[in-house]
Curated annotation (Swiss-Prot):
Gene designation per UniProt: HPT
Protein name (Swiss-Prot/TrEMBL): Hypoxanthine-guanine-xanthine phosphoribosyltransferase
InterPro entries to which the protein is assigned, alphabetical: HGPRT, Hxn_phspho_trans, PRibTrfase_dom, PRTase-like
Provenance organism: Tritrichomonas foetus (Trichomonas foetus)
Entry annotation: catalytic residues: D106 (proton acceptor)
This protein's pathway: Purine metabolism; GMP biosynthesis via salvage pathway; GMP from guanine: step 1/1; Purine metabolism; IMP biosynthesis via salvage pathway; IMP from hypoxanthine: step 1/1; Purine metabolism; XMP biosynthesis via salvage pathway; XMP from xanthine: step 1/1
Domain of life of the native organism: Eukaryota
Protein family membership: Belongs to the purine/pyrimidine phosphoribosyltransferase family.
Amino acid sequence: MTETPMMDDLERVLYNQDDIQKRIRELAAELTEFYEDKNPVMICVLTGAVFFYTDLLKHLDFQLEPDYIICSSYSGTKSTGNLTISKDLKTNIEGRHVLVVEDIIDTGLTMYQLLNNLQMRKPASLKVCTLCDKDIGKKAYDVPIDYCGFVVENRYIIGYGFDFHNKYRNLPVIGILKESVYT
């Protein structure tokens, strides 16, 4: 991999492109086994999960209906405590199997509130697939993670969709941002 100025802002790489793609293929095999006859609605939580979602879909061997949602319970880096949906689903999920695809579960607040919102729409089933689960000890919100790519340490993660002030998303690796960049 060619070094770029953005790579200089990494303390270290946690997962390279090969690691990420290998784990995505493994997750896709698990998902295919479960969903092969269910025609689920697969919801991408934008913007961070778009890289993971796109690569994951390429390896799934079953019929599905893609959809997208933009939501947050944060303003900047501060939690508002309330879920704001700025782009809702186009698909009616009542009676459908639903898989929410997320980039990372941190405290669990946003996902907890999103799952509560989606559950009110009466899906047949509701599951979560996240690329990363941040190891922060006991999470503030109990979120069931049905499929997880990696457990990452409690540091500022960037690359492959993860951002810092909307930068670094396009790094092809997952890494830890140097503390000097954000302090």
